[in-house]
Amino acid sequence: MIKIAVAGGVTGGHLYPALAVLKELEKLTPIDVLYFTVSGKLEERVLKDYNYKKVSLKIQGLKRPVYSIENIKRLFKIFNANNIVLKELKKFKPDIVFVTGGYVSYPVGTAAKKLKIPLYIQEQNVIPGLANIKLSSFAKKVFVSFEESKKYFQRDVVVAGNPILICHKENLNFEKKTILIVGGSGGSEFLNSLACKLSNKLKDYHFILSSGRKEVPCKSENLTILDYIENMSDYYSAVSCAITRGGATTVSELIFFDTPSIIIPWEGSTEAHQIENAKQIEKLGLGYVIREKEVNIDEIANKIIELSNRERKGSPKTNPAILIAKEIKNEVLK
């Protein structure tokens, strides 16, 4: 058995790669999981369906610029979280700690260092997040999703790809050509508005919008609105085309399922992460990247028509989660 403490959440981009690796690791060996969550965030809702031990931390990420007065309060909460994490890790006694980024990873990773527990990191973005870069200086191994990410890390780096959580819940078979619009786990008012305009313009197409519980300013017979989609793999496999933000996990899923795509990166992402991630779609010839300020409804409608008529040519791929799980299992159970 492998006892593993995990941190990675707040957004689906950090949460689902962690769950994908745990799912594959459990196929190889029994596991006992302690998952550190952020109070009130996505992972607390999703992890209700998982039989893992959980510890909720009341912390927030630092605001930018970092010299903000608000950060004094947030640093105090992080300090308190450090003590909680140390206490829980001493009690749980994990064989390894596995983190997938986001601010919850930092107190868990630093506690692993203090307790001399081997630390494994998985990075989703082309440009790594600050927490993972800081933690990598004492990590046993860093798994990255893209070759371009290697230069940011100095220790053992494995280009494994981004783990994909494959979760088959529905056999989807759409009669009409169907366009999926997803604004990330938190939704996007911009993409919600875009879905209204496109569904009105392309009446012969069926649109599915994952709204993130944000307001959708229209109703239309050819627009299906869902608050949130957990089984994204079913949808990416079945739709004709997707319009999404440029989160690393989203981009990796689109590549894995060979889904023709239009990426409209969120301009507020840290250090333009989403723009760099989105470039992978154009690099592979899988679709287009359009900046928000350049969005033109007629142009996007034409691109939808073109992409939805493409024949998918992607060959079967090995889920990076399998590669990472095997690597961890082989190192821990030598």
UniProtKB/Swiss-Prot annotation:
Q: Which InterPro entries match?
A: GlcNAc_MurG, Glyco_trans_28_C, GlycoTrans_28_N
**One Pfam family hit:** Glyco_transf_28
* Functional pathway: Cell wall biogenesis; peptidoglycan biosynthesis
- Compartments in which it is found: Cell inner membrane
Primary location class: membrane
EC number, as in UniProt = 2.4.1.227
Query: Which GO terms fall under biological process for this protein?
Result: carbohydrate metabolic process; cell division; cell wall organization; lipid glycosylation; peptidoglycan biosynthetic process; regulation of cell shape
SUPFAM superfamilies per UniProt: UDP-Glycosyltransferase/glycogen phosphorylase (SSF53756)
Q: Which reaction does it catalyse?
A: di-trans,octa-cis-undecaprenyl diphospho-N-acetyl-alpha-D-muramoyl-L-alanyl-D-glutamyl-meso-2,6-diaminopimeloyl-D-alanyl-D-alanine + UDP-N-acetyl-alpha-D-glucosamine = di-trans,octa-cis-undecaprenyl diphospho-[N-acetyl-alpha-D-glucosaminyl-(1->4)]-N-acetyl-alpha-D-muramoyl-L-alanyl-D-glutamyl-meso-2,6-diaminopimeloyl-D-alanyl-D-alanine + UDP + H(+)
| Topology within the bilayer | Peripheral membrane protein
Binding annotation for UDP-N-acetyl-alpha-D-glucosamine: T11, G12, G13, N125, S185, I229, Q274
Q: Name one GO molecular function term.
A: UDP-N-acetyl-D-glucosamine:N-acetylmuramoyl-L-alanyl-D-glutamyl-meso-2,6-diaminopimelyl-D-alanyl-D-alanine-diphosphoundecaprenol 4-beta-N-acetylglucosaminlytransferase activity
Q: Which UniProt keywords apply?
A: Cell cycle, Cell division, Cell inner membrane, Cell membrane, Cell shape, Cell wall biogenesis/degradation, Glycosyltransferase, Membrane, Peptidoglycan synthesis, Transferase
Gene Ontology cellular-component terms for this entry are: plasma membrane
Q: Does the keyword Cell inner membrane apply?
A: yes
Please give the function described in this protein's UniProt entry: Cell wall formation. Catalyzes the transfer of a GlcNAc subunit on undecaprenyl-pyrophosphoryl-MurNAc-pentapeptide (lipid intermediate I) to form undecaprenyl-pyrophosphoryl-MurNAc-(pentapeptide)GlcNAc (lipid intermediate II).
Query: Which family would the database say this protein is a member of?
Result: Belongs to the glycosyltransferase 28 family. MurG subfamily.
Q: Identify the PANTHER family for this entry.
A: GLYCOSYLTRANSFERASE, UDP-N-ACETYLGLUCOSAMINE--N-ACETYLMURAMYL-(PENTAPEPTIDE) PYROPHOSPHORYL-UNDECAPRENOL N-ACETYLGLUCOSAMINE TRANSFERASE 1
The record's annotation in HAMAP family points to: MurG
User: What name does this protein carry?
Assistant: UDP-N-acetylglucosamine--N-acetylmuramyl-(pentapeptide) pyrophosphoryl-undecaprenol N-acetylglucosamine transferase
Q: Which organism is it from?
A: Thermosipho africanus (strain TCF52B)
